[in-house]
Protein backbone atom coordinates (compact mmCIF):
# COMPACT_ATOMS: atom_id res chain seq x y z
CA UNK A 1 0.00 0.00 0.00
CA UNK A 2 2.87 2.35 0.81
CA UNK A 3 4.33 1.87 -2.68
CA UNK A 4 0.97 2.65 -4.31
CA UNK A 5 0.72 5.79 -2.17
CA UNK A 6 4.24 6.84 -3.14
CA UNK A 7 3.52 6.31 -6.81
CA UNK A 8 0.35 8.39 -6.43
CA UNK A 9 2.31 11.26 -4.87
CA UNK A 10 4.93 11.12 -7.63
CA UNK A 11 2.23 11.00 -10.33
CA UNK A 12 0.59 14.03 -8.76
CA UNK A 13 3.94 15.86 -8.73
CA UNK A 14 4.54 15.04 -12.40
CA UNK A 15 1.07 16.29 -13.38
CA UNK A 16 1.56 19.49 -11.39
CA UNK A 17 4.96 20.03 -13.03
CA UNK A 18 3.33 19.58 -16.45
CA UNK A 19 0.72 22.22 -15.57
CA UNK A 20 3.43 24.57 -14.26
CA UNK A 21 5.35 24.27 -17.52
CA UNK A 22 2.17 24.99 -19.47
CA UNK A 23 1.36 28.07 -17.40
CA UNK A 24 4.95 29.31 -17.73
CA UNK A 25 4.40 29.63 -21.47
CA UNK A 26 1.75 32.28 -20.83
CA UNK A 27 3.42 35.66 -20.94
CA UNK A 28 1.14 37.58 -18.63
CA UNK A 29 1.03 38.24 -14.89
CA UNK A 30 -1.78 35.75 -14.32
CA UNK A 31 0.11 32.95 -16.08
CA UNK A 32 3.25 33.70 -14.07
CA UNK A 33 1.33 33.67 -10.78
CA UNK A 34 -0.20 30.29 -11.71
CA UNK A 35 3.28 29.00 -12.58
CA UNK A 36 4.67 30.11 -9.22
CA UNK A 37 1.76 28.53 -7.35
CA UNK A 38 2.11 25.24 -9.21
CA UNK A 39 5.89 25.21 -8.79
CA UNK A 40 5.46 25.60 -5.03
CA UNK A 41 2.86 22.83 -5.08
CA UNK A 42 5.28 20.60 -7.00
CA UNK A 43 8.01 21.33 -4.44
CA UNK A 44 5.60 20.55 -1.61
CA UNK A 45 4.69 17.19 -3.19
CA UNK A 46 8.36 16.27 -3.55
CA UNK A 47 9.19 17.32 0.03
CA UNK A 48 6.16 15.40 1.31
CA UNK A 49 7.41 12.35 -0.62
CA UNK A 50 10.77 12.75 1.14
CA UNK A 51 8.96 13.11 4.50
CA UNK A 52 7.03 9.91 3.87
CA UNK A 53 9.67 7.67 2.33
CA UNK A 54 13.22 8.78 3.21
CA UNK A 55 14.39 7.25 6.50
CA UNK A 56 16.18 9.20 9.17
CA UNK A 57 14.99 11.38 12.02
CA UNK A 58 16.68 14.62 10.95
CA UNK A 59 15.55 14.32 7.32
CA UNK A 60 11.98 13.58 8.42
CA UNK A 61 11.84 16.57 10.80
CA UNK A 62 13.31 18.87 8.14
CA UNK A 63 10.90 17.60 5.49
CA UNK A 64 7.89 18.09 7.80
CA UNK A 65 9.04 21.64 8.57
CA UNK A 66 9.58 22.41 4.89
CA UNK A 67 6.14 21.00 4.07
CA UNK A 68 4.56 23.33 6.61
CA UNK A 69 6.61 26.27 5.33
CA UNK A 70 5.64 25.51 1.74
CA UNK A 71 1.98 25.63 2.80
CA UNK A 72 2.59 29.25 3.85
CA UNK A 73 4.20 30.11 0.53
CA UNK A 74 1.45 28.32 -1.43
CA UNK A 75 -1.17 30.42 0.38
CA UNK A 76 0.76 33.59 -0.46
CA UNK A 77 1.00 32.52 -4.11
CA UNK A 78 -2.74 31.83 -4.10
CA UNK A 79 -3.30 35.30 -2.64
CA UNK A 80 -1.23 36.88 -5.44
CA UNK A 81 -3.08 34.84 -8.06
CA UNK A 82 -6.43 35.95 -6.63
CA UNK A 83 -5.34 39.57 -6.57
CA UNK A 84 -4.13 39.44 -10.18
CA UNK A 85 -7.29 37.63 -11.25
CA UNK A 86 -9.59 40.18 -9.60
CA UNK A 87 -7.42 43.19 -10.43
CA UNK A 88 -7.02 44.15 -6.77
CA UNK A 89 -3.21 43.97 -6.67
CA UNK A 90 -2.57 47.52 -5.47
CA UNK A 91 -5.33 47.40 -2.85
CA UNK A 92 -3.57 44.90 -0.60
CA UNK A 93 0.12 45.96 -0.63
CA UNK A 94 0.25 46.01 3.19
CA UNK A 95 -1.26 42.54 3.40
CA UNK A 96 1.24 41.29 0.84
CA UNK A 97 4.19 42.71 2.76
CA UNK A 98 2.95 41.41 6.12
CA UNK A 99 2.30 37.96 4.64
CA UNK A 100 5.77 37.80 3.13
CA UNK A 101 7.46 38.85 6.39
CA UNK A 102 5.38 36.32 8.30
CA UNK A 103 6.25 33.54 5.84
CA UNK A 104 9.98 34.31 5.99
CA UNK A 105 9.95 34.19 9.80
CA UNK A 106 7.83 31.04 9.85
CA UNK A 107 10.08 29.34 7.31
CA UNK A 108 13.14 30.21 9.38
CA UNK A 109 11.54 28.87 12.57
CA UNK A 110 10.40 25.65 10.88
CA UNK A 111 13.84 24.99 9.39
CA UNK A 112 15.51 25.83 12.71
CA UNK A 113 13.17 23.32 14.37
CA UNK A 114 15.15 20.55 12.64
CA UNK A 115 17.91 21.03 15.22
CA UNK A 116 16.08 22.63 18.15
CA UNK A 117 12.76 20.71 18.17
CA UNK A 118 11.08 23.71 19.79
CA UNK A 119 7.92 23.40 17.67
CA UNK A 120 7.57 19.68 17.00
CA UNK A 121 9.51 16.45 16.94
CA UNK A 122 9.10 13.06 15.34
CA UNK A 123 8.32 10.53 18.07
CA UNK A 124 8.37 7.42 15.92
CA UNK A 125 8.87 6.43 12.30
CA UNK A 126 7.18 3.15 11.42
CA UNK A 127 6.18 1.52 8.17
CA UNK A 128 2.52 2.42 8.71
CA UNK A 129 2.86 5.95 10.11
CA UNK A 130 5.08 8.79 11.25
CA UNK A 131 4.09 10.24 14.62
CA UNK A 132 4.60 14.00 14.82
CA UNK A 133 4.37 15.44 18.33
CA UNK A 134 3.98 19.17 18.85
CA UNK A 135 5.64 20.54 21.98
CA UNK A 136 3.40 21.99 24.68
CA UNK A 137 5.87 24.86 25.00
CA UNK A 138 5.19 25.75 21.38
CA UNK A 139 1.49 26.47 21.94
CA UNK A 140 2.23 30.18 21.60
CA UNK A 141 3.78 29.42 18.22
CA UNK A 142 0.87 27.28 17.09
CA UNK A 143 -1.73 29.80 18.23
CA UNK A 144 0.13 32.68 16.61
CA UNK A 145 1.14 31.00 13.38
CA UNK A 146 -1.45 28.40 12.44
CA UNK A 147 -4.83 29.73 13.47
What spans do the regions from the language model cover?
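C-terminal ends of transmembrane helices
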Residues: 17-26
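Juxtamembrane/interfacial segments flanking transmembrane helices
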Residues: 115-121
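Conserved small/polar residues in nucleotide/adenosyl-binding loops
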Residues: 145-147
Amino acid sequence: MRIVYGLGVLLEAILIAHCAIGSFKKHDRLGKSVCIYETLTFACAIVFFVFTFVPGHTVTVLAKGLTMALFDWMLIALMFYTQYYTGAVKTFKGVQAASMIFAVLDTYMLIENTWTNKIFDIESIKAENIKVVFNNDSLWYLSLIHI
